[in-house]
């Protein structure tokens, strides 16, 4: 059924590649059109990101996350050895993502997409160019995963406008790879040593200050005013040109319709301080294929459920990460500059009506490859609801526990586990989860 439906994914980063693989697993005819990254960049990934890549089929890319770098935090006058992160060259990482796409026999086209997406007989039409020659492609659905610089034009909501200024450096040999983050008067600084005498320094600041910077010398003058010693600027040589890119939080108002959707940074992008964009991208790409499957194969009512489900998930993830960023900015109280004032007051706190948890509700869930409404148990840690613990359906269990005493619930729990042949180890994990989420208690 799905093999006759053509889906075009624009972009082959984490969001685009993992969405394409998910769609291929559902049997769709998938084509990925991408452009190479225009500049060299390094990025830090967590162990959780590595596990996410593996679960979504990006196994070759995950294998680049091998050597971890110690991450030091010098934030708000407090110094910590926070944790470790995998620092990878994004150009090499992107090539591995392409290899993952090839493993699934997904068609890949390196080309520049021209103009906006047109509609022909109610089907999206993409025009792209290779060596000055134009081609067009008709699709049943389009996924825009071209990152925060997507040409997709639409209104978006954004936070204070920050820009990150990135410079590659040649450094003396350092014993082990490392990264650090420092809060300073006019922003914050990320430094990285990635081995083979290669290092990076990145300064994130307000738009007004960033507009005064055209080269590394301009940035260096500002860094000298920050009253901080920077280890990456001891015996260094500048490599290449300074890269300037926006790094503020923004979310498109129109994320999805019945012909196309935005995934990853195309849909919403966050301040690097708020969290890892890769994890945010995978939160979207893990559900996007099932949303598309529903849109292309189900009734209008079911399509609307899927569209609303995706939109609300993206908005929830965005709100969650922006709050995390604000909490970090509020920790710094030494500076009263424009940079810190703006970010310590955004986003404004929402007066949300608190509902009782845990509770049973009917909500959209992914089940059997589609999005449909089903009963779920809403808990403090599962605002969208849960209907499974692993592969165990838990709604009947949750209903009984919420309607009966603790003693009766414990007896029913044992009967439930016995009837479903649940092992003792899994039963204990399920019981601990039910207690933690206040379903049992």
Model segments located where?
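C-terminal helical "tail/cap" subdomain of flavin- and related membrane-associated enzymes
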Residues: 293-377, 387, 395
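FAD/FMN-dependent oxidoreductases across multiple families
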Residues: 211-297, 302-326, 333
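Glycine-rich FAD pyrophosphate-binding loop
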Residues: 12, 24-42
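Short beta-strand to alpha-helix junction loop
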Residues: 80-100, 210-214
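Predominantly flavin-linked oxidoreductase catalytic cores and closely associated redox partners
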Residues: 104-231
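Long, charge-rich, low-complexity alpha-helical segments
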Residues: 128, 388-441
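Beta1/beta-strand and adjacent pyrophosphate-binding region of the FAD-binding site
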Residues: 2-15
């Amino acid at each position: 059924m799905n093999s006759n439906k053509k889906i075009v994914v624009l972009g082959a980063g984490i969001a685009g590649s993992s969405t394409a693989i998910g769609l291929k697993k559902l049997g769709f005819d998938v084509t990925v059109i991408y452009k190479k990254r225009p500049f060299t960049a390094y990025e830090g990934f967590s162990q959780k990101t590595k596990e996410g890549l593996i679960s979504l089929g990006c196994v070759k890319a995950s294998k680049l996350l091998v050597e971890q770098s110690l991450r030091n935090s010098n934030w708000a006058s407090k110094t910590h050895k926070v944790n470790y992160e995998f620092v990878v060259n994004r150009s090499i990482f992107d090539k591995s993502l392409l290899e993952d796409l090839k493993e699934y026999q997904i068609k890949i086209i390196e080309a520049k997409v021209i103009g906006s997406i047109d509609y022909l007989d109610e089907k999206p039409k993409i025009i792209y160019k290779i060596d000055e020659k134009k081609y067009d492609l008709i699709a049943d659905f389009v996924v825009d995963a071209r990152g925060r610089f997507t040409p997709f034009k639409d209104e978006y909501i954004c936070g204070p406008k920050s820009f990150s200024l990135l410079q590659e450096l040649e450094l003396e040999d350092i014993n082990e790879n490392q990264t650090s983050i420092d809060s300073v008067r006019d922003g914050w600084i990320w430094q990285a040593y990635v081995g083979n005498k290669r290092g990076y320094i990145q300064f994130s600041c307000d738009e007004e200050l960033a507009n005064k910077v055209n080269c590394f010398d301009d940035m260096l003058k500002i860094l000298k005013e920050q009253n901080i010693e920077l280890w990456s600027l001891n015996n260094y040589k500048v490599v290449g040109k300074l890269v300037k890119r926006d790094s503020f939080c923004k979310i498109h108002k129109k994320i999805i319709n019945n012909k196309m959707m935005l995934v990853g940074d195309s849909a919403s992008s966050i301040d690097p301080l708020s969290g890892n964009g890769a994890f945010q991208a995978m939160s979207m790409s893990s559900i996007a294929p099932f949303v598309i499957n529903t849109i292309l194969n189900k009734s209008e009512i079911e399509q609307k459920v899927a569209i609303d489900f995706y939109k609300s998930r993206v908005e929830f993830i965005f709100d969650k990460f922006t709050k995390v960023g604000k909490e970090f900015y509020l920790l710094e109280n030494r500076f009263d500059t424009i940079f810190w004032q703006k970010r310590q007051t955004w986003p404004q706190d929402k007066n949300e009506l608190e509902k009782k948890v845990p509770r049973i509700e009917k909500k959209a869930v992914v089940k059997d490859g589609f999005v449909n409404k089903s009963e779920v148990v809403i808990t403090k840690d599962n605002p969208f609801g849960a209907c499974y613990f692993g592969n165990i359906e838990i709604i009947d269990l949750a209903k009984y526990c919420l309607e009966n005493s603790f003693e009766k619930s414990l007896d029913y729990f044992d009967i439930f586990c016995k009837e479903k042949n649940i092992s003792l180890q899994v039963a204990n994990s399920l019981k601990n989860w039910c207690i933690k989420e206040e379903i049992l208690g």
